């Protein structure tokens, strides 16, 4: 297990993208993100793997995730990974969406990308509330029943 960390690409991708921001700043070009995970030694799954293949074979981002170049363009890979833009943009959903626009298209278009933009914005907006459960929400009302 030490030699092969397993197939946890959703975590590895987040950490790779954060590392790129740390090294190159918030205006890092899309190629720096694409090349970072394409050349990384960890295993990938579905749309991430297809994007890696495309990048390593000359199809640059963002076309690496386009449906014409990837049968996984609508997969949920970016949706799963999109927590990091929201966590890096607390209370700033537009900033999270800008990150998603740049990075999400490396591996996804269509539903996979839209889901990622939504998730990133939700994570970002979570920082604007001091209530984890709305008082009038169904779960809270159900939980309070005797």
Label the model's feature ranges.
Residues 1-146:
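Structured, active/binding-site neighborhoods that engage oxygen-rich ligands
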